[in-house]
């Protein structure tokens, strides 16, 4: 390897330097404090686990995004976490085993073998919150409200939210008796809004079901879409009509809490179809080609850990949040330059200053006073009349 290559990082892997790293850390603390104020408890999950545990209950997408290695001690295959959500679901279902609702939050680096999009980071800092143990729309409204409060805290401008419900397509597909292969093909066509393919794949189905499945291509837009969907899907199974009712309930409650939030509905949006079971949502901003925060309901995942629990939650990339947010992050500025001196009284003074939250940087042997400014110090400790005093840094 050439010397120059030793400094190269893999595509999508970044290092974060000062002062950006400090901004990210301050934002992390602020967001976790926000989550705590809503009753969410912080958990820390392992960076690496046995693969069967890491991927339990997850879809193929997560498998493809997971870096895999062999554990030299056990010989078993392990994976670096690519998504913290399934790990937190396991904590709720298998470790905590609470009977009532449980609110958990997390923040940590994840690693992606494949990026989410062409220019996406493969080492995002995933931040999120999950609510377990309640299947009502109230839980969905709560986590969506918390997600929006997080974006308000970061002062991310011009956000709009997309809402969908995977139960609509799932209910229609089950009623049509689609095979697994056809269901997957139809799913792919709906994501691309490929109406010709959708028509071809639904030929031979009962006319009413074919029409309803085809309608999902263009059932998208503002809140009026829900009324249109009620008419066009009037003959759908009860589960589909209940899903529409849930979407309407959630939209009404969000409009009360966030009257200026633009809501967009897409009933053919099946983000996380093999993972989510109910409402799905995502936040977008102009100029960014993918969602900046996303989530939904995933009631079935706990069953893979021996205890099915209703669940809903969201996640975001903290680095993206800091990049897009306009909130002023207050970073420590200035500091006190401590001379290279072994005096006990100086050490006691420095300890007191640091305990008060002051930043004190010690000079190393041979360092000139000019080095103090390079260390962002604007004051210095000087001994006067036998006492160590904090004075402005000499020019």
From Swiss-Prot:
Look up the record and name the pathway of this protein. Answer: Amino-acid biosynthesis; L-histidine biosynthesis; L-histidine from 5-phospho-alpha-D-ribose 1-diphosphate: step 1/9
Keywords, sorted A to Z: Amino-acid biosynthesis, Cytoplasm, Histidine biosynthesis
Q: Which compartments does it reside in?
A: Cytoplasm
Task: Tell whether Plastid is among the UniProt keywords.
Answer: no
Is Cytoplasm among this UniProt entry's keywords? yes
Q: What are the GO cellular component annotations? A: cytoplasm
Per the record, the domain of life is: Bacteria
Q: Name one Pfam family in it.
A: tRNA-synt_His
Signal sequence region: none
Q: Which GO terms describe its biological process?
A: L-histidine biosynthetic process
Which family would the database say this protein is a member of?
Belongs to the class-II aminoacyl-tRNA synthetase family. HisZ subfamily.
The record's listing under HAMAP family reads: HisZ
Q: What is this protein called?
A: ATP phosphoribosyltransferase regulatory subunit
